[in-house]
From Swiss-Prot:
Pfam families: FGGY_C, FGGY_N. PANTHER family: GLYCEROL KINASE (PTHR10196:SF69), SUGAR KINASE (PTHR10196). It comes from Streptococcus gordonii (strain Challis / ATCC 35105 / BCRC 15272 / CH1 / DL1 / V288). InterPro entries: ATPase_NBD (IPR043129), Carb_kinase_FGGY (IPR000577), Carb_kinase_FGGY_CS (IPR018483), FGGY_C (IPR018485), FGGY_N (IPR018484), Glycerol_kin (IPR005999). This is Glycerol kinase. ADP binds at T14, R18, T268, G311, G412, N416.
Length: 502
């Protein structure tokens, strides 16, 4: 065993950190996971302690070594993937954050975002960054920290403070301050990065009064950014050579290397990303334009659609309504439903995401009769996830002017066979479920391994994460369109009800 080499992926998520060791076949050798504290200072605010995140990462690195018996000198390279947009500002000399990390979900900077919109910057920001102006992205979070921590603006202008998303923070810590870098995919989510010119945008920085000296250097997704300081990696000096935001890492882990390839991660929400190739395409229908990844001197762009409620709708059945004991049980109930699919659940618990962007909408149910059973209700909830995915896939095809032939899927709810079959039916295309559902961590490992020659090229990677199961559509066209028309009616009625509430 002592001669075998491995790749370690660090997957720093919203609620936990994980370290996974992969072998040459792309198989998981061991993993370790640690949750950390969610901080809610006020309603709608979400923060993390950046030092606690760093401690959790150190803990899972140790855990992965202990579980596997792999030694630090057997790790050929490290790949990092992370919760995107979450913002850290720290003191360059002490290495201490000057405020908590402001998390992507946090709405504390919404007034700043509204101010930018009212000043007429929507189109300018969209053309430069591919994003809509929103508190979701890092730009307003940096501005908020500089405004609310005494003396921060002045210190930033003197070059005493550094900004980074979580990838940047972890590389800076692992290298003991030797590398202050980010990658294309994370930079593209800051709302400060010009994704066409591939540079920090001076005009946006001026509008927000953010000193350029704070910003990390932007690098490709697969290159050596630095080496671990031996005292942070149990004596090992290992290259950190792959980085990507979590959804882009999943795109890469799903081997979606060709333009037109699309992946959907069924997590708490659902994130659908299409590789659009080397040409940047601005969405005309409220999807986000972003960078998928950049390797070998080329940058590949992507369109992204976000669904707020996917797997969490099944959690609601379990925890809120107590209709199921556990999430996998929903499949059994759905298969035992014998109604004619006339019940529609619109799970707009926190509004509707793409392509509607209706924050006032709330959850609703249509088509109930005296004969409606628990099984019917559970089935309708699962179907709502598939209908929302169709909303985005239809929009993507219009934006990209291309027909999507197959949808690559991963994430927890992708294990639900009923949902996957209904997804294939309502889209009318094949659903390819990855054999290895650890696609986010695998994507980071692939990027790291390519850079150091652990894997030779994309062709070698294509042999590693084959499709586990293919779901083919079996519903006839008229039935499919009749069901989808009912969904569109249900969404419209939900939005009308929200208007009446005003």
């Amino acid at each position: 065993m002592s001669q075998e080499k491995y790749i370690m992926a660090i997957d720093q998520g919203t609620t936990s950190s994980r370290a996974i060791i992969f072998n040459k076949k792309g198989e998981k050798v061991s993993s370790s996971q640690k949750e950390f504290t969610q901080i809610f200072p006020q309603a709608g605010w979400v923060e993390h302690n950046a030092n606690e995140i760093w401690n959790s990462v150190q803990s899972v690195i140790a855990g992965a070594f202990i579980e596997s018996g792999v030694k630090p000198n057997q790790i050929e390279a490290i790949g990092i993937t992370n919760q995107r947009e979450t913002t850290v500002v720290w003191d360059k000399n002490t290495g201490l954050p000057i405020y908590n990390a402001i998390v992507w979900q946090s709405r504390q900077t919404a007034p700043l975002a509204e101010q930018l919109k009212s000043q007429g910057y929507v189109e300018k920001f969209h053309e430069k960054t591919g994003l809509i102006i929103d508190a979701y992205f890092s730009a307003t979070k940096v501005r908020w920290i500089l405004d609310h921590v005494e003396g921060a603006q002045e210190r930033a202008e003197k070059g005493e403070l550094l900004f980074g998303t979580i990838d940047t923070w972890l590389v800076w810590k692992l290298t003991d301050g030797a590398a202050h870098v980010t990658d294309y995919s994370n930079a593209a989510r800051t709302m400060l990065y010009n994704i066409k010119e591939l540079k920090w945008d001076d005009e946006i920085l001026e509008i927000l009064n953010i000193p350029k000296a704070m910003l990390p250097e932007v690098r490709s997704n697969s290159e050596i950014y630095g080496k671990t300081a031996p005292f942070h990696f149990y004596g090992g000096e290992v290259p950190i050579s792959g980085m990507a935001g979590d959804q882009q890492a999943a795109l890469f882990g799903q081997l979606a290397f060709e333009p037109g390839m699309v992946k959907n991660t069924y997590g708490t929400g659902s994130f659908i990303i299409m590789n659009t190739g080397e040409e940047m395409q601005l969405s005309e229908n409220n999807l986000l334009t972003t960078i998928g990844y950049g390797i070998n001197g080329k940058v590949y762009y992507a369109l992204e659609g976000s669904i707020f409620i996917a797997g969490s709708a099944i959690q609601w059945l379990r925890d809120g309504l107590r209709m199921v004991e556990n999430s996998p049980e929903s499949e059994k109930y759905a298969l035992n439903s014998h109604n004619n699919d006339e019940v529609y659940v619109v799970p707009a618990f926190t509004g509707l995401g793409a392509p509607y962007w209706d924050q006032n909408a709330r959850g609703s149910v249509f088509g109930l009769t005296r004969g409606t059973s628990k099984e019917d209700f559970i089935k309708a909830t699962l179907q709502s996830i598939a209908y929302q995915v169709r909303d985005i896939i239809d929009t993507m095809q219009v934006d990209a002017k291309t027909a999507i032939q197959v949808l690559k899927v991963d994430g927890g709810a992708a294990m639900n066979n009923f949902l996957m079959q209904f997804q294939a039916d309502i889209l009318g295309i094949d659903i390819a479920r990855a054999k290895n559902l650890e696609t986010t961590a695998l994507g980071a490992a692939f990027l790291a391994g390519l850079s150091v020659g652990y894997w030779k090229d994309l062709d070698e990677l294509r042999t590693l994460n084959e499709t586990g199961e293919l779901f083919e559509p079996s519903m006839n066209e008229s039935r499919k369109e009749q069901l989808y028309k009912g969904w569109k009616k249900a969404v419209k009625a939900t939005q009308v009800f929200a208007e009446i509430d005003d």
